[in-house]
Regions:
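Short, well-structured beta-strand
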Residues: 97-165
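Beta-propeller blade termini
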Residues: 212-221, 264-274
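C-terminal motif of bacterial Sec signal peptides marking the signal peptidase cleavage site
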Residues: 17-20
Length: 367
């Protein structure tokens, strides 16, 4: 029985590859008591037997999409999740995709394996709330990562869950560069030339030990499944979680995003993916500029900016801008707000993530 299923799946996958068209296939018939293996020309996924008869799939040359059968037939879409393979991160980063790992075919071709979810409700919302999904849809949607862990290369290659995602596996050369900068005492000019924060030097001035005051943290700030590297200050109180350098992965290689210093630093919001740039423009001006790190890019995506500017309006110095001018690199069209409304809008962003940075002293060898 299993060999027959695999033969049918292989034929379907070949047809999809040859025609370049989506192929609608109903899998997991209620009469079958065997797990169902769904394949395309790159990878396969095994679905448990207890899901048989509850889902449908659409298979293409590089992805497999899963639909709740009941919701789909009722006219509500039914899309639950999609697993896809991409040779280049630029083919998928920036959308709804989250990386799950990497698949290497027998001939050495490397693919990102990613998962994506619906952007809107795909079941009968007239009878169910969002957190009260139909039972079969919920099993499909909530079990998606468990099903995705069964991914296998169809040609005998390997799939590594979590590969190419975790900071400790990605940023070793960058960490080594900071260790060298601390050991050799690079000055501010050298650090700037290397696109590194001058705080590496500032935190090590005099009798201070930069390796104990500066650290690093790995965290996926933009929810694409791949960690960013944050270089921050080890401190307590309101400054805990402050960082000065951001690195991300671009086409599977580390890339520097932005640098700051003590009067132009960064903090990650506790909820969501936004980063706050806290800055001071003098005794009477300070503000917070919020942005997101663009997936697979060294660029940032500005969101909104707040500032108190007594130079411009000493009586009501509260301003908000939702308009960033990419050509000049400046926020424009600032709107003046009463203090109460300004503070209310600021409060919507919540608290900061008080990150615990790993001191560089823990990775420095004693010579």
């Amino acid at each position: 029985m299993k060999k027959k299923i695999l033969s049918v799946l292989t034929a379907v996958a070949m047809l999809a590859a040859l025609t370049g068209c989506d192929i609608n296939v109903n899998y997991g018939t209620a009469s079958s008591a065997q797990p169902q293996v769904i394949s395309n020309p790159i990878f396969s996924i095994e679905m448990p037997a207890d899901m048989n008869g509850t889902y449908e799939t659409i298979v293409t040359d590089h992805n497999i999409s899963f639909y709740d059968k009941e919701s789909k037939e009722a006219g509500f879409g039914g899309f639950a999740f999609d697993v896809a393979a991409y040779k280049e991160p630029s083919e998928h980063m920036g959308g709804m995709d989250t990386k799950l790992g990497e698949l290497t075919t027998k001939d050495g071709t490397l693919y990102d394996i990613v998962i994506s979810y619906p952007s809107d409700v795909q079941f009968d919302y007239t009878n169910y709330e969002y957190n009260d999904m139909p039972a079969n849809y919920a099993r499909l949607y909530n079990g998606s990562e468990n099903y995705a862990q069964t991914v296998k290369s169809v040609d005998g290659g390997e799939f590594a869950w979590g590969a190419g995602m975790h900071g400790e596996d990605l940023y070793g050369d960058v960490i080594s560069k900071y260790v060298t900068a601390i050991k050799e005492g690079w000055d501010a000019n050298k650090l700037e030339a290397e696109a590194m924060t001058p705080m590496v030097y500032a935190l090590g001035e005099g009798e201070k030990n930069a390796e104990d005051r500066l650290g690093f943290a790995y965290i996926d700030t933009n929810f694409d499944g791949v960690d960013e590297l944050l270089i921050g200050e080890i401190t307590e109180g309101e400054g805990k979680g402050t960082f000065y350098d951001i690195y991300t992965m671009v086409d599977r290689k580390p890339a520097h995003v932005i640098s700051g210093w003590n009067r132009n630093s960064f903090m990650l919001l506790q909820a969501g993916s936004m980063i706050c740039n806290n800055y001071s423009g003098g005794a009477a001006e300070n503000g917070q500029r919020f942005f997101i790190v663009e997936p697979n890019s060294p660029e940032i995506i500005p969101q909104v900016a707040f500032k108190t500017d007594e130079y411009e309006n000493p009586d009501q110095p509260y301003f908000i801008s939702y308009d960033y001018d990419y050509e000049s690199g400046e926020w424009i069209n600032w709107e003046n707000y009463p203090k109460t409304e300004y503070e209310e809008r600021m409060s919507n962003f919540g608290d900061f993530n008080r990150l615990d940075f790993t001191p560089f002293s823990t990775v420095m060898t004693v010579e």
